[in-house]
């Protein structure tokens, strides 16, 4: 077998050269990549590899799992079973032979050392036991000698002690005799004194009885206390006093004091005497020195000497009652503290964090401020974003007045036919497209030009780098052109002006420059900063120059973005697709958006299930300045919301729910504020007519635009009220809502489903479909105009001059007049003018010509006029006859 190089052997074995060199090194052979390998070395390597393959596993892991059930008692006598699973894991590691020999040697040495230590310990214990026995023997000998000496001393003292005892006994007997004699004398004296007291008491009692019999008056003698029963009577008095005290306490607590106090009196005499006997027995047992402890039913509660300082956690807003509960005080105390600080509040009033902090610190508590958006900040900060920024494509928004050729211009650039697909030839959605040019990529946003789409244009200006302002050369600056300029200036975005329709004969580019200069858009040739490009979307003139101008402006801006890391962007448009669910058009600003990423988007969250570009093709990722449609959100996000990729779906859901709750709180607070501010305006609310509308559209941007346009139509007499709005088709719920609120169902580029149509037919609802916003607004205007009350207008139909005044018994003063203008008609309202000043306004009661009643008198004829309830008519006055006509008003 011939020698081969190591590289050839590596290629033959299909392993890397470095791996093969390492295997040779493990087998004990040093080789480099260019060395040759002999047959013997191959055999050595093969044997080494076989040994490695045959060797068993170095590590063995055993797992054991046990399950048990634990019963936990719960409330209401019910118990709950909890499943407990215990997992144990043990790993055995196989050692190599050399390691095993080394460990065995160490264990043997350790055993020998332990044996040696044990023998030494036994010898030490023997020595200590021998020494202890010797010490005990010596101590025993000492004790025996001491006891012997003690016995000898006791025998010597025994004789002398006996003599002393005899003398003590004699003295004690003499003392006892004297004490007995003294006790006998004392007893006799006490008996004599008691006898004298009894005789005196009997004498006094007989004297009192004799005097009572003499006066024939019976009296109850005062009881004489027996000194022998002193303790018994004392205990009885004490118990009576305690019973009286207890009755007062119990009577004060209960509703009926008399009933409570009378309750112990109902007890029998046996129970009372038993208690008295027990008290007396206890008192007698105590003797003179014994004291019975006083008992009382009153429970004493003392107020804490010092206030308890607590840690009070305060959120961004808190009510006065909640703050009082956290501090464990009454709400009135918190209100008093706020009044001292100069703030008036009720117990249910919501106060801000700063005010609550001042009040809590004033009352001596420690305050812990809690930010409610702490979780949101933590989620947003826990993101991977790359550090290196790279150049990115510019995002260009095309703005301008309606029908000035914005979409057609973009259409020519993209070589597609978008304008023909839009209803009415006007753009009603934001179209996001990116196109490749020879000099780089450009992302275009096409915004609507109609006045109703103000929010869409503002959103486009916020998400863009450069604004291309399209102005028709034959039309000049129009209202939406001015609005687009204002949006661009507010966003601080440079403007490139595209003067379109330059191929028309009536085109006047200089007029466009002059008009734009009035709004601060000056061309470069006039010393300004804006580039002006003459284009024709129809003929394709100047398109390349426009793209070059855009790329030049982008180069000046030095647009950069981070490509690596988690993506972030903005929602350009969103809608609800019946088959795919919520769909959002997202413009990525930085990072890379991948399929499967977890995104947080305003009030919604979800995982990106699919991504499509503007051509409807599936893509797996999208970098900066790339618009894509994403699927998988929990709901339809609002256009303009920030899109952020996060790590944890659970936390994203919590943040989305927090945002929804916060939005609801702000909305309710705003409604409450408006109710308070418009209190007087709402007093006449019943006189205002309302047009209720349930609006459904295909995309979120259209819902916003139509809602804003309709709400702006409201007047003091007729108001438009959007009862409900949303994205998607008209459902049965929408129809039911419209029936309940007497509303008009409006569908913009959507249709009603079968169940909704049944409800609409049964309830006879007004359902209208639209595809052009002009028609929708015009019809709502017409409906509102029908609700307006007509305008009353006074029209002068005749004027007569008073030439003479006659008296009539029936009508009073009659004015003889000459009709100078128009026609005088009977029963019409009139005004009497004197020196061109109205002095009376009333009704024409009588109109005669030659004593005949007539209905009207024409110009140039004489007549007699009687004014109802007015007699102060003079010569030279003018009588003006007018009529009131109704004029139907319309919404402008």
From Swiss-Prot:
Residues covered by region (G3): 446-449
Coiled coil stretches, renumbered: none
Family designation: Belongs to the TRAFAC class translation factor GTPase superfamily. Classic translation factor GTPase family. IF-2 subfamily.
Annotated spans, G5: 536-538
Annotated Gene Ontology cellular component terms: cytosol
Entry keyword set: Cytoplasm, GTP-binding, Initiation factor, Nucleotide-binding, Protein biosynthesis
Region Disordered, annotated ranges: 88-306
CDD domains (alphabetical): IF2_eIF5B, IF2_mtIF2_II, mtIF2_IVc
A Pfam family per the record: IF-2
NCBIfam families: IF-2, small_GTP
Biological function: One of the essential components for the initiation of protein synthesis. Protects formylmethionyl-tRNA from spontaneous hydrolysis and promotes its binding to the 30S ribosomal subunits. Also involved in the hydrolysis of GTP during the formation of the 70S ribosomal complex.
Family matches, as Gene3D superfamilies: P-loop containing nucleotide triphosphate hydrolases, Putative DNA-binding domain, N-terminal subdomain of bacterial translation initiation factor IF2, Translation factors, Translation initiation factor IF- 2, domain 3
Name of protein: Translation initiation factor IF-2
Location of region: G2: 425-429
Domain tr-type G: 391-560
GO molecular function: GTP binding; GTPase activity; guanosine tetraphosphate binding; translation initiation factor activity
Basic residues composition-biased segments: 254-269
Taxonomic superkingdom: Bacteria
InterPro entries (alphabetical): DNA-bd_dom_put_sf, EF-G-like_DII, EFTu-like_2, IF2_assoc_dom_bac, IF2_II, IF2_N, P-loop_NTPase, Small_GTP-bd
Chief localisation class: cytoplasm
Cell location: Cytoplasm
